[in-house]
């Protein structure tokens, strides 16, 4: 189109005519020009013939010619990238190509050229249309002049109604009739005619400018009916005409008002006399202001479709009007009201400004004009806020507003005093400034210089002023309308503005998250805590508003850090408490009712709830809980809950006719609400592992879980302040034995399983399938996915043990189709262990339901303790083997083949998973899906042991490697130093050096010798010993006849199989390992104390297998003596508490209240810090966990408990153990952080596919090596070791 000829122009005109002719009915039926434009813009969606129009075909061909080759090149690039492994769908490719095309030079040139050409074509069509219209009007004028002599009668009341267009002659007549010299009736009739005409016709007339001037002049007419008619015409124009026409009306009205306010002739109200809105002059003025304001609020909805100059003219005329200010002088002693006062009367909350600032299109113009020409508008708004605060400080609350409309009055008043007008203007200014601060360019308008003040008002000054307004401003009477008081009370209005700022993160960081503002918020609270005089008029309502803002600050990471540590996180000044400490102290005093000025207040429970809510935002995080721990808030909240619960129980049952009925109806709902609030506060302690320990110590875990179920059933939308959804709370609670029992007793598990069964077995059969299922069937139907993940979250080993231990399967002879499972045992019986025809017949969707059960079994059995328990109780391996045996067909007399189907493939996978131990390179798990080709499943199936060798990797490492010089140097450390502290540090340095340079050397017999010597010498240093020495004299003969649990026996066999595979153990190792385990149980039993508890895990010996002892036995190459002697020495070190899980089972070294919870220090200490460090070091992964409704603590607890068996290769397990033994127990935390950092990409991917917990439990840690992350872990040690070791050392009972 570079050569655009006249023929091309004619052709395009014809195409456009065809298009407009086709859509003529749609356009002419539109009520306004904006609607017509919208119809054209959406034509492709609404017109089925859209692509048949010649103009559309022309555009498509033009785009193809100009951009076709470039689009094809981009498509080829994307296709090649996809073939190289980048997984991107069709939509992604389209988006990429579209973006690249729109950013290209060719596209911009094409659009520029096309716009220029279309402008020429459209301009020519408009000119031709105007010529046709002129000729048509001439003909019409001639016809009218001929017909007026022959027919003076008309059926209508106006000749206008008989014409299609409003003629010029008629407008000239109206202009003459509107002249001030004309009689009143003539002028009124002219206005009546004008209002009857379509505004677009009037505005398109050539005399429109003159008419506009006449109307503007006539607005000053004293006759109210006449001005009302003009305003009616203006209103019609605003409603029905396009922007470029209504802009004329708006600017003329704004200019009129500006002149009106500047004129000395008009008798404007003064501030001292106030405003009587029944006064005719004031009424007329307010009508004009209101009309202007109504259009202000409507204009932003459509002005983006018009040239920017129209919008700018409207904005500038408005700002010019609002900037009009009457200066006081000796000639005019009284303050005359400015236009802004009247705008505040009709739009108190400055809604017009909110709408103008919403879109970037208009916001840019507003802010530019405010900065360059009308900054005085912002200055006066700030000045008004400053003056109002000074007024509040100078006068008592009840003297500030004698008739506080903002607090609500029963009788409607039509008079506004000067003080009330000042207050209304203050509210308008407050809302305007609040909206201004949201935007970056708006904040750049500060600081503001005020008259009679030396210092400028900065952003921080303004925010401090806002917070002071909450405390100093008058509070509303308690009996007034709640709605009114909430809408217009000063404290509520300021709080609304601060809430708005909090919701904008960038704005909040710049404005609110600094020590000056938080100190201003906390100052009266701090004074109340210390017992000194608080700010004047610091009411309970003000405190509630402040708590609301503090809760919002604490809900954002930057705000939380500010409250926890202040702006200077490295400050060592202990006397200056941070915000979190002040809030915690104040909340504790409130709970203990230790603040005298609030005693007996009806609002006290609300104040308590508000500040506990702030604390909840803080202690709901790991780092926040650490700061608030010394205040014992869990105990104070629990005490308050028990007191409230006891009071509610004492309320008598209302009896009809008794005097107590009314009092009970009033007290009971408030009491129940306060009790629920306290339970919710307690429940939120479960958001972190250590918080869950504190919750269980209070004894309220059952009530909290029951409350959670009631809330979960309502399925509430979790608001922004609640950072943790109930799904994460369930995961944390289910990670402990007591929590699992509480979930069972509350009915949560029953409700979950009932919902699962409804989706699994009772799903709709008439659901339309849009595509056939994959082969084999989709493992878990979409409707059941949520229930599946909920069960995966629930079934940690502590939960599995409490819910299934010592319970047999029902194994009924017959199952009713109406019989719905209600517990985990029922799920095992009906979906997993299908060992009878009765169970199979009871399932309506047998294949889908059993597949679901097998998938669940696969995930649960990834926890080796859970696998051993299920194997010991239900022999799941034999059940699966038997099912495989039955799923065969005979092909010859002595040979049978397996039937390949979805269930047999799933069973084969589970059998390999639960029978082979090994890391990512030590075992091979068969896939769950069939392959394309002639052999869809090349993996061998089996129905008896041993497993086919193809599932084990070839060439396991030999037990003894040739000793390296580095490991030799490491062992020599134990002989060369006289000072114990020196050799310990020297040995650790050498170990780190070896792990970084030659990690494979730390393996085999050399590793066993290293650990043995290091621990022996370490225990010779009393300062390194954490637990006391225990005398143990039992011999093999003493323990030989002791029995091991079935779980321990199965675990022992599993260990020996793995050790033989690795060439670490020899024949007879099983008996040696059995003796080691028996000695360990006897040795640890000497250090246990009796525990009275209903929890199964606390009754008797440790419930799981001792994976640490098994690992040590393999490291020591099956040497029983070395293994047990090492463990005896090792048991004195702090590290043993975190590596050797059974070490602290029912241990007398733990506090009694900790012992009774059944929670291991690995969970409430190590896992707690894993979550805390993960949030700080790998925030994306931390966020991914919470988006998935899963907790890092649960999977890390599983990894640590089984010493990473099945997740890491043997050499990496050795490195993990050696690292923790040599460098300290805190390295357990650092290793887990390194693992999660290593998995970051996979974790983010599986968060999107919504199967994160399944991935983490089932998948080995591919590619992870401890040595690769050694420097990273050393950095973590430098940053966190003091805090971690201090907390780890605090787990033991403190000697007094």
Curated annotation (Swiss-Prot):
Organism phylogeny: Eukaryota, Metazoa, Chordata, Craniata, Vertebrata
Pfam families: BROMI (PF14961), BROMI_C (PF23440), BROMI_N (PF23431)
Organism in which the protein naturally occurs: Mus musculus (Mouse)
Knockout-associated phenotype: Mice exhibit exencephaly, poorly developed eyes and preaxial polydactyly, due to defects in ventral patterning.
Keywords, alphabetical: Cell projection, Cilium, Cytoplasm, Developmental protein
Gene for this chain: Tbc1d32
One example of a Gene Ontology biological process annotation: smoothened signaling pathway involved in dorsal/ventral neural tube patterning
GO cellular component labels: cilium; cytoplasm
Functional summary from the UniProt entry: Required for high-level Shh responses in the developing neural tube. Together with CDK20, controls the structure of the primary cilium by coordinating assembly of the ciliary membrane and axoneme, allowing GLI2 to be properly activated in response to Shh signaling.
Subunit structure, as described in the record: Interacts with CDK20, which promotes CDK20 stability and function. Interacts with FAM149B1; may play a role in cilium assembly.
Secretion signal, residue range per the UniProt entry: none
Compartments, record wording: Cytoplasm; Cell projection, Cilium
Domain Rab-GAP TBC intervals: 1158-1281
Name this protein carries in UniProt: Protein broad-minded
Alphabetized InterPro entries for the sequence: BROMI_C, BROMI_M, BROMI_N, PHAF1/BROMI, Rab-GAP_TBC_sf
Chief location: cytoplasm
């Amino acid at each position: 189109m570079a050569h655009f000829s006249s023929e091309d122009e004619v052709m395009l005109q014809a195409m456009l005519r065809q298009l407009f002719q086709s859509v003529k009915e749609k356009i002419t039926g539109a009520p306004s020009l904006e609607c017509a434009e919208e119809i054209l813009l959406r034509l492709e969606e609404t017109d089925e013939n859209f692509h048949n129009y010649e103009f559309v075909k022309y555009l498509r061909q033009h785009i193809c010619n100009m951009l076709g080759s470039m689009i094809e090149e981009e498509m080829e690039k994307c296709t090649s990238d996809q073939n190289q492994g980048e997984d991107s769908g069709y939509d992604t490719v389209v988006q990429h190509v579209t973006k690249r095309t729109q950013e290209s030079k060719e596209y911009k040139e094409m659009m520029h050229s096309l716009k220029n050409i279309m402008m020429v074509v459209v301009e020519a069509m408009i000119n031709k249309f105007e010529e046709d219209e002129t000729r048509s009007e001439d003909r019409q004028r001639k016809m009218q002049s001929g017909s007026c002599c022959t027919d003076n009668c008309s059926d209508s009341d106006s000749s206008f109604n008989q014409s299609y267009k409003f003629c010029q002659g008629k407008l000239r007549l109206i202009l003459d009739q509107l002249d001030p010299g004309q009689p009143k009736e003539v002028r009124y009739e002219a206005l009546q005619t004008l209002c009857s005409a379509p505004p677009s016709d009037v505005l398109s007339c050539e005399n429109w400018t003159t008419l506009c001037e006449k109307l503007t002049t006539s607005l000053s007419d004293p006759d109210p009916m006449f001005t009302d008619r003009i305003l009616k015409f203006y209103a019609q124009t605003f409603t029905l005409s396009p922007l470029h026409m209504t802009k004329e009306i708006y600017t003329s009205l704004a200019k009129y008002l500006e002149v009106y306010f500047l004129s000395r002739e008009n008798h404007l109200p003064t501030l001292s006399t106030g405003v009587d809105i029944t006064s005719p002059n004031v009424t007329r003025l307010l009508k004009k202001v209101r009309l202007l304001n109504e259009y202000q609020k409507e204009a932003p909805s459509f002005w983006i479709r018009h040239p920017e100059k129209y919008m700018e003219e409207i904005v500038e005329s408005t700002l010019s009007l609002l900037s009009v200010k009457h200066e006081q002088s000796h000639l005019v002693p009284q303050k005359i009201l400015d236009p802004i006062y009247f705008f505040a009367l009709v739009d108190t909350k400055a809604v017009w400004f909110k709408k103008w600032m919403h879109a970037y299109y208009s916001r840019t113009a507003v802010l530019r004009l405010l900065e360059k020409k009308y900054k005085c508008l912002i200055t006066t708004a700030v000045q008004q806020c400053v003056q109002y605060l000074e007024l509040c400080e100078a006068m008592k609350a009840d003297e500030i507003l004698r008739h506080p409309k903002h607090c609500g009055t029963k009788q409607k008043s039509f008079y506004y005093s000067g003080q009330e007008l000042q207050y209304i203007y203050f509210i308008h200014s407050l809302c305007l400034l609040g909206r201004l601060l949201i935007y970056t360019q708006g904040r750049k308008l500060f600081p503001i210089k005020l008259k009679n003040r030396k210092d400028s008002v900065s952003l921080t000054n303004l925010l401090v002023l806002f917070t002071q307004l909450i405390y100093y401003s008058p509070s509303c009477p308690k009996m007034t309308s709640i709605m009114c008081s909430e809408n217009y009370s000063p404290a509520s209005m300021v709080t609304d503005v601060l809430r708005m700022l909090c919701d904008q993160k960038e704005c909040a960081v710049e404005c609110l998250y600094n020590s000056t503002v938080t100190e201003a918020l906390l100052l009266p609270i701090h004074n109340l805590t210390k017992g000194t005089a608080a700010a004047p008029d610091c009411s309970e309502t003000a405190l509630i508003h402040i708590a609301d803002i503090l809760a919002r600050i604490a809900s954002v990471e930057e705000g939380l850090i500010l409250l926890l540590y202040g702006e200077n996180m490295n400050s060592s000044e202990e006397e200056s408490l941070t915000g979190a400490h002040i809030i915690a102290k104040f909340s504790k005093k409130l709970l203990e009712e230790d603040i005298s000025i609030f005693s007996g207040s009806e609002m006290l429970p609300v104040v308590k709830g508000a500040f506990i809510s702030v604390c909840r935002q803080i202690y709901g995080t790991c780092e926040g809980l650490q700061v608030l721990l010394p205040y014992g808030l869990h105990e104070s909240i629990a005490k308050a809950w028990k007191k409230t619960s006891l009071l509610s129980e004492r309320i008598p049952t209302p009896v009809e006719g008794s005097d107590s009925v009314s009092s009970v109806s009033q007290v009971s709902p408030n009491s129940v609400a306060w009790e629920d609030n306290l339970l919710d506060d307690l429940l939120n302690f479960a958001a972190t592992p250590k918080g869950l320990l504190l919750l269980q110590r209070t004894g309220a875990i059952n009530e909290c879980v029951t409350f959670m179920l009631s809330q979960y059933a309502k399925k509430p939308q979790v608001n922004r302040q609640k950072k943790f959804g109930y799904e994460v709370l369930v995961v944390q609670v289910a990670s402990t034995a007591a929590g699992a029992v509480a979930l069972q007793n509350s009915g949560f598990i029953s409700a979950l399983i009932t919902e699962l069964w409804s989706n699994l077995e009772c799903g709709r059969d008439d659901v339309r399938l849009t595509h056939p299922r994959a082969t084999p069937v989709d493992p878990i139907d979409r409707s059941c996915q949520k229930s599946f993940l909920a069960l995966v979250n629930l079934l940690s080993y502590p939960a599995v043990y409490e819910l299934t231990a010592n319970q047999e399967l029902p194994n009924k002879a017959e199952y009713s189709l109406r019989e719905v499972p209600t517990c985990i045992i029922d799920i095992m019986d009906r979906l997993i262990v299908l060992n009878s025809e009765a169970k199979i017949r009871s399932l309506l969707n047998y294949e889908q339901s059993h597949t679901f059960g097998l998938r669940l079994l696969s995930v649960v059995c990834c926890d080796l303790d859970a696998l051993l328990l299920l194997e010991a109780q239900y022999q799941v391996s034999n059940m699966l083997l038997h099912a495989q045996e039955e799923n065969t067909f005979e092909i010859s007399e002595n040979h049978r083949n397996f039937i390949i189907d979805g269930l047999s493939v799933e069973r084969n996978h589970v059998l390999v998973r639960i029978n082979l131990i090994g890391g990512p390179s030590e075992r091979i798990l068969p896939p769950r899906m069939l392959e394309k080709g002639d052999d869809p499943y090349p993996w061998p199936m089996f129905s008896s042991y041993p497993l086919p060798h193809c599932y084990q990797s070839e060439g396991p490492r030999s037990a003894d490697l040739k000793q390296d010089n580095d490991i030799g140097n490491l062992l020599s450390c134990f002989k060369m130093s006289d000072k114990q502290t020196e050799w310990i540090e020297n040995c650790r340095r050498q170990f780190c050096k070896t792990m970084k340079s030659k990690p494979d050397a730390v393996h085999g017999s050399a590793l066993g010798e290293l650990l043995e010597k290091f621990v022996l010498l370490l225990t010779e240093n009393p300062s390194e010993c954490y637990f006391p020495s225990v005398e143990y004299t039992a011999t093999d003969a003493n323990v030989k006849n002791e029995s091991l649990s079935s779980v321990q026996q199965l675990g022992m066999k599993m260990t020996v199989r793995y050790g033989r595979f690795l060439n670490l153990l020899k024949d007879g190792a099983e008996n040696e390992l059995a003796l080691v385990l028996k000695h360990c149980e006897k040795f640890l039993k000497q250090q246990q104390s009796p525990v009275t508890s209903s929890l199964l895990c606390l009754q008797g010996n440790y419930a799981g297998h001792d994976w640490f002892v098994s690992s040590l036995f393999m490291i020591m190459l099956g040497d029983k003596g070395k293994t047990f002697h090492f463990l005896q020495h090792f048991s004195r070190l702090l590290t043993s508490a975190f590596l050797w899980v059974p070490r602290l089972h029912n241990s007398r070294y733990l506090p009694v209240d900790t012992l009774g919870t059944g929670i291991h220090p690995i969970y409430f200490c190590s896992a707690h810090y894993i979550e805390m460090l993960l949030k700080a070091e790998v925030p994306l992964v931390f966020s991914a966990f919470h988006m998935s409704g899963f907790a890092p603590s649960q999977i890390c607890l599983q990894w640590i408990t089984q010493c990473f068996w099945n997740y890491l290769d043997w050499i990496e397990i050795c490195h993990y153990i050696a690292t923790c033994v040599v460098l300290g127990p805190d390295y357990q935390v650092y290793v887990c952080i390194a693992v999660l950092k290593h998995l970051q990409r996979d974790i983010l991917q599986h968060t999107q596919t919504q199967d994160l917990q399944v991935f983490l439990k089932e998948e080995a840690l591919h590619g992870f090596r401890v040595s690769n992350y050694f420097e990273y872990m050393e950095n973590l040690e430098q940053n966190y070791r003091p805090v971690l070791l201090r907390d780890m050392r605090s787990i033991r009972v403190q000697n007094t």
